[in-house]
């Protein structure tokens, strides 16, 4: 058994550090032979120096890590607590020194803030819809499907986007920002009285903008000037005159519907006649085909008799 190991003294550790600083790590024999350190390290071998140096490095690294952890823990404890809102502490580990990044609180929004955010989202959806209709720039307006396809190509809509789009288009049409004609939407013309306009005003504007057909006996299409004159005359009508004009328009509409029904009946009758004629033609074709087949059979029988009978008679004679 060798001699028991003795604890390292502070003088020996100081001599070891000075020797490494002078000669470098791994030069254990050189350090032991150095006259300045040989007297202090006379009871140590090169293996002892190597082990001690390794242990000293481990102790130093462990203590530094503990110091960093303690400082980080103190930093976390010094963060003020918020009783009204919840805090989320995000720790990011660094490969260099394992520092802790400053925490950012994730604050739960109150009901007023949520309402504000929802109103902002609704306003943003309004702007997106108006932008889509403006960029599509279709003369007669854009269909809901066309608007949805444009928004889906430009943005990332939510899962319930179709429902939101339908509701928002309805709201915009009711408020007068959009005009709906034949399931198509277009932006209403801006005017100073747009805010005071009733929900039914877009229909009147549509009558002014679109080519209007006034049905009469000759069914003619009025021009823009004629439409303006007619609208001006309607604006100056009394209640009695307006009721008479409405009754006349209803009567004209009923007459047009009656004419349409009569035309539909005539079309059905013509279609029935065409089907009957086609059936007659098919029957005649089948009859002619069967008749030609019968004639062909008779001709074959006659030809066979003309050939067989002379042969039979000559054989018996």
Swiss-Prot record:
Which stretches make up the HTH myb-type domain?
A: 1-61
User: Any idea where this protein resides?
Assistant: Nucleus; Chromosome; Nucleus, Nucleolus; Chromosome, Telomere
Q: Where are the transmembrane segments?
A: none
- Coiled-coil residue spans: 244-288
State if DNA-binding is listed as a keyword. Answer: yes
In alphabetical order, the GO MF annotations are: double-stranded telomeric DNA binding; protein homodimerization activity; single-stranded telomeric DNA binding
Quote any Pfam family the record assigns. Answer: Myb_DNA-binding
Which residue intervals define the domain H15 in the entry? 121-189
- UniProtKB keywords: Chromosome, Coiled coil, DNA-binding, Nucleus, Telomere, Transcription, Transcription regulation
| GO terms for cellular component | chromatin; chromosome, telomeric region; nucleolus; nucleosome; nucleus
List, in alphabetical order, the GO biological process terms annotated in this UniProt record. Answer: nucleosome assembly
What's the family? Belongs to the histone H1/H5 family. SMH subfamily.
What remark about domains does the record contain? HTH myb-type domain confers double-stranded telomeric DNA-binding while the H15 domain is involved in non-specific DNA-protein interaction and multimerization.
> What does this chain do?
Binds preferentially double-stranded telomeric repeats, but may also bind to the single telomeric strand.
Q: How does it assemble?
A: Forms a homodimer and heterodimers.
Q: What is this protein called?
A: Single myb histone 6
């Amino acid at each position: 058994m060798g001699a028991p190991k003795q604890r390292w003294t502070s003088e020996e550790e100081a001599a070891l550090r000075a020797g490494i600083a002078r000669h470098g790590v791994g030069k254990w024999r050189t350090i032991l032979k150095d006259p300045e350190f040989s007297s202090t390290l006379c009871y140590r071998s090169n293996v002892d120096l190597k082990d001690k140096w390794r242990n000293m490095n481990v102790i130093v690294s462990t203590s530094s890590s503990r110091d960093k952890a303690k400082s980080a823990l103190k930093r976390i404890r010094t963060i003020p607590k918020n009783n009204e809102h919840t805090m989320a502490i995000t720790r990011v580990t660094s490969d260099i020194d394992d520092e802790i990044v400053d925490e950012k609180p994730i604050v739960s929004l109150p009901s007023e803030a949520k309402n504000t955010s929802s109103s902002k989202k609704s306003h943003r959806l309004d702007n997106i819809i108006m932008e889509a209709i403006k960029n599509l720039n279709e003369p007669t307006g854009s269909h809901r499907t066309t608007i949805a396809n444009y928004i889906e190509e430009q943005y990332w809509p939510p899962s319930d986007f179709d429902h939101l789009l339908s509701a928002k288009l309805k709201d915009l049409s009711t408020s007068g920002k959009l005009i709906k004609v034949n399931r198509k939407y277009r932006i209403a013309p801006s005017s100073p009285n747009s805010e005071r306009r009733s929900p039914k005003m877009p229909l009147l504007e549509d009558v002014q903008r679109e080519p209007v057909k006034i049905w009469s006996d000759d069914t003619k299409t009025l021009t823009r000037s004629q439409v303006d004159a007619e609208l001006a005359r309607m604006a100056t009508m009394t209640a009695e005159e307006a009721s008479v004009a409405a009754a006349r328009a209803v009567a004209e509409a009923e007459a047009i519907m009656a004419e349409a029904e009569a035309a539909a009946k005539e079309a059905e009758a013509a279609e029935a006649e065409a089907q009957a004629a086609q059936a007659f033609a098919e029957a005649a074709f089948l009859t002619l085909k069967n008749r030609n087949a019968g004639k062909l059979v008779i001709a074959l029988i006659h030809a066979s008799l003309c050939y067989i009978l002379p042969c039979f008679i000559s054989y018996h004679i």
